[in-house]
Design a protein with these regions (language model features):
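Helicase motor core with emphasis on the C-terminal RecA-like subdomain
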Residues: 2-10, 14, 18, 22-44, ...
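C-terminal accessory regions
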Residues: 359-384, 536, 543-545, 618
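Short alpha-helical segment immediately N-terminal to, or the first helix within
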Residues: 26, 301, 366, 560-561, ...
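Short flexible coil/turn linkers enriched for glycine and charged/polar residues
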Residues: 198-200, 321, 371, 566, ...
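Accessory DNA-binding and partner-docking regions appended to nucleic-acid-acting proteins
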Residues: 1-3, 356-357, 386-681
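Gly/serine-rich nucleotide phosphate-binding loop at the start of the catalytic core
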Residues: 59-60, 246
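The −1 position to Zn-ligating cysteines in a subset of zinc-ribbon hairpins
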Residues: 326, 376, 391
Length: 681
């Protein structure tokens, strides 16, 4: 049996992706390998298939217990003899699993790196004949990486202590050139064959949204994607708990995951999400590598993470099945303060802090750049950039760009006038013409450009400064309170040798509302009744087998069944993702559903919140016109959005919406409640 036979027999695929076959053949030829492949590119198959074909056992060192559990369940379900040892497995049971591996009953053994501490266990492990040691999430070994784990530093000494050195292979989804070099040195892979498939994930669309009511956006988005699995990442435990509470109050089946919960609570939350008992997981970065769920359709970052490495890894939890998925980052300047606090209050040495600030600045620039988001990420990881992707939020807004050279020159001259000694807040205040105590004390009211942008909002000026940093016209120098300095690119503009194009001041405000409406439209993809019937059968089988539904078949495989409608076992075996083992086990059950056909197509209902919101806008605008006041003086758009979502039935409930005081409740409360409920209460 060769690699292609194993691929079809156990995994149900006819062909390999990209460089999978090259990686596998290199391993089988007896050469060490280091592979940097994006999440969803099929890294696991690259070591699982050789493990099946090599004569002795394979140990896979993996960082998170929950990931081991999911992978072993999936392999066992496919008929592959696998097991794991970690802190959840009793000591005697761990030793027994080593005995089973020694006897050839187990081909793949997943192991936590903490198990490599010298002990009787490692003594027993050294007596087990091994063909290969696999280091998964290998970036964890690098002190320059975003997820450094000291336990990974023990791997090389463990391998060196074995009576006979096995093949050593290392896999990761994200690694900058610096981290890649550190991985080679720390794992003893200087002579390894290196495979870089490119980190691009074409099925993912990226979006950055600034300002607005982030909580409301998430509530509406999740509600309009209620049948799809998603992850919402927050920067703090408190934010996780608050978002979880709001989603639960809104009737959304959500789970939460952070380090402040007990092991049992986290395990239960993980299982509920994996088994589709909850559709949304709200989590800190403690929940990331520990999820192997293939059908996550969206990942939303409620707050900006600490680095692009973290962001791309967390966003990469979406669309592992290859189907389209969305990655949305909701950015606010306050997020920078949170991450700065984490860096300043950590126990890292100064050099590590410096690296952390560099990574944080790159993350901020991603949020502020006006260029293609996909290309920005690829360039950061040392990849060659391509044509703009055409479907990230920046590419979609490209037509809104205009010539802004005059404004850029004004800003660059201000930076020079201030002798490149101040940060964005001071520069923006000077341009705005703010006569603050600080500016007076620093004698900055006499700067030639003082007040030249007095007609612009202060926030818009700061946003422009950040965009110029992200696009390479300015750079930050010093931490934690950086000053802004000109780059050669900005100096060319001042010399009249280059023009600057970007968004007009405040243009993002207008586009933000349009983007929200677009994002809140429910998906209209053709998910007919047959697909839903197949999903229901999968859910039933998963409950019978006590495994997550995606372990039975992925969404992509069910969609292929619904599309191709096989009528025989032979035709079912040709469906992408249906292997021989699963065909024999489940084929007839799924064929029965396909032959019977679907009852009726599933039709998405129209979003009632959007209709009510329009009615509330009309009522608010009518009141404003009658009283001769600005609309926001009556109720802000954000307050109306919360009314449409929470639907208060009384004046008391209306008063709970943020920013609505007793006077407004008394004056307009009855009108608002009647607009929402009519004569029903």
């Amino acid at each position: 049996m060769g690699p292609r036979d194993v691929l079809k027999e156990y995994f149900g695929y006819d062909t390999f992706r990209t460089v999978q076959e090259d990686v596998i053949s290199t391993i089988l030829s007896g050469k060490d390998v280091m592979a940097i492949m994006p999440t969803g590119a099929g890294k696991s198959i690259c070591f699982q298939i050789p493990a099946m074909l090599l004569p002795k056992g394979t140990v896979i060192i993996s960082p998170l217990i929950s990931l081991m559990k999911d992978q072993v369940e999936a392999l066992t379900e496919q008929g592959i003899p696998a097991s794991y040892v970690n802190s959840t497995v009793p000591y005697e049971e761990s030793i027994e699993r080593l005995r089973d591996m020694y006897r050839g009953k187990i081909k793949l053994l997943y192991m936590a790196p903490e198990k490599l501490e010298p002990s009787y266990f490692t003594h027993c492990l050294s007596m087990v004949p091994l063909s290969m040691v696999v280091i998964d999430e290998a970036h964890c070994v690098s002190q320059w990486g975003h997820d450094f784990r000291p336990s990974y530093r023990k791997i090389k000494s463990f391998i060196d202590s074995l009576p006979q050195r096995p093949l050593v292979t290392a896999f990761t989804a994200t690694a900058t050139p610096l981290v890649e070099q550190d991985m080679k040195e720390s794992l003893g892979l200087a002579a390894a064959a290196v495979f870089r498939t490119g980190l691009d994930r074409p099925n993912l669309s990226f979006r950055v949204m600034q300002g607005g009511n982030r909580e409301y956006f998430i509530l509406r988005y999740v509600k309009s994607h209620r049948k799809e699995s998603g992850i919402i990442y927050c920067a703090t435990r408190k934010a996780v708990d608050e978002m979880y509470d709001r989603l639960s109050q809104a009737g959304i089946t959500a789970g939460r995951y952070h380090a402040g919960m007990t092991d049992e609570e986290r395990r239960q939350a993980q299982d509920d999400f994996s088994y589709d008992r909850t559709t949304v997981m709200v989590a800190t970065n403690a929940f990331g590598m520990g999820i192997d769920k293939s059908n996550v359709r969206y990942v939303i970052h409620y707050q900006m993470p600490k680095s692009l490495e973290s962001y791309y890894q967390e966003a990469g939890r979406a669309g592992r099945d290859g189907a389209k998925a969305e990655c949305i980052l909701l950015y606010s300047g306050k997020d920078v303060h949170i991450q700065t606090y984490f860096i300043e209050n950590g126990n890292q040495p100064e050099e590590q802090k410096r690296m952390d600030y560099q990574r944080l600045n790159a993350m901020i620039d991603y949020c502020q750049t006006s260029s293609c988001l996909r290309n920005y990420v690829l360039a950061y990881f040392g990849e060659k950039v391509k044509e703009p992707c055409g479907h990230c939020s920046n590419c979609e807004n490209r037509t809104a760009k205009v010539r802004i050279t005059d404004a850029a020159v004004l800003i660059f001259r201000t930076v020079l006038s201030l002798r490149e000694r101040y940060g964005a807040s001071i520069i923006a205040a000077v341009l705005k013409g703010k006569k603050t105590k600080e500016l007076i004390e620093k004698d900055l009211l006499t700067v030639p450009t003082f007040g030249k942008l007095s007609f612009e909002k202060l926030g818009h000026i700061k946003s422009a400064l950040n965009s110029f940093v992200a696009d390479g016209y300015l750079f930050r120098d010093g931490q934690p309170y950086p000053v802004l300095k000109l780059t050669d690119k900005a100096k060319e503009v001042l010399a009249g040798k280059a023009e600057v194009y970007g968004l007009a001041f405040g243009a993002e405000d207008a586009m933000k509302e349009a983007a929200v409406e677009r994002d809140l439209d429910p998906r209209r993809e053709s998910r007919d009744g047959l697909f839903e019937a197949l999903r229901e059968l999968r859910r039933t089988l998963a409950a019978e087998e006590h495994v997550p539904p995606f372990v039975i078949f992925s969404d992509a495989t069910l969609e292929a069944m619904a599309r191709e409608r096989p009528e025989s076992m032979e035709a079912m075996g040709a469906v992408h993702g249906v292997g021989a083992f699963k065909l024999q086990k489940y084929g007839e059950r799924f064929l029965e559903i396909i032959r019977t056909g679907a009852e009726e197509p599933v039709i998405e209902e129209k979003d009632p919140d959007a209709q009510l919101l329009q009615q509330l806008f009309s009522v608010r605008n009518a009141i404003a016109a009658k009283e001769g006041l600005a609309r926001n003086r009556i109720f802000t758009d954000e307050q109306l959005q919360e009314m449409a979502f929470w639907r208060p039935k009384t004046k008391l409930e209306l008063k709970r919406i943020r920013g609505i005081g007793p006077k407004k409740v008394d004056r307009y409360g009855e009108t608002i409640v009647k607009c929402i409920w009519g004569d029903r209460i």
